[in-house]
Amino acid sequence: MKPLLFPITVILVLAAPAVLRAQAATDSGTFVLLHARDTVALEQFSRGPTKLVGTLALRNAKRTSERYSAVIAPDATLPLVEVTVREGVDSGPRKAKVVQRARVIFKQDSAAVDEVGDAGLMTRVFGTETGAVPYLNLSFALLEQAVRRARLTPGGSKISFFNLGGGQTIAATLSPLGADSVKLDIGDIRFHLRVDSAGRVLGGRIPVQDVVVQRK
């Protein structure tokens, strides 16, 4: 599968009507990624009981943005995820250029990828691990999904990620790091994440990259 962006080495309301309870179950926010105090990316996301959507906007020369939409299963896996990569920004009648679209369907230990790019439509099937979580470089909303998945899995210190930027499956380890934090080792990259009791990521760091993540 053509890389989507970068390789892996980057770095409740009580007694409320049903509609209000549904709204309370929806969580949204923005992750701000900083390197040496400069903003390198912004990720806006919304997570409901059955769907996770977000846009990761990179502060690069091409003004790349990646919009994703994923189905959330009861076990916190994401059996279907769609990603659209665009370059530039919408300006009046001129729209940002769509450079790639991809859809990934997970079933047991395989991932079927439909990709539309410059070469047309391409379909590939990759081997992976059952329950693997999609990994999109710099997406902390997807890392949060992995934390939520781990908390629902017996002995959930081990997590598998399916790299959307290459099709590899990467083993990861989740370990406690103080009362309100965890460390997540994905390959040789370590993430420090501040989390709450529900598994929401409140902020974090990538120490080796000198990247700080704030949630707003």
Say what each PLM segment does.
Residues M1-L5:
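Positively charged n-region of N-terminal signal peptides that target proteins for export
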Residues P7-P17:
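Bacterial N-terminal signal peptides
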Residues A18-A22:
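Sec/Tat signal peptide C-region and signal peptidase I cleavage site
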Residues Q23-A25, D38:
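Boundary of Sec targeting at the N-terminus
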Residues L34-V113, G199:
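N-terminal mature ectodomain segment of secretory-pathway/periplasmic proteins
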Residues T39, G92-I186, R205:
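Solvent-exposed helix/loop surface patches that form functional interfaces
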Residues R59-T64, D188-F191, V211:
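Solvent-exposed loop/turn segments connecting transmembrane beta-strands
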Residues F191-V208:
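Short, exposed beta-strand-loop hairpins at the edges of beta-sheets
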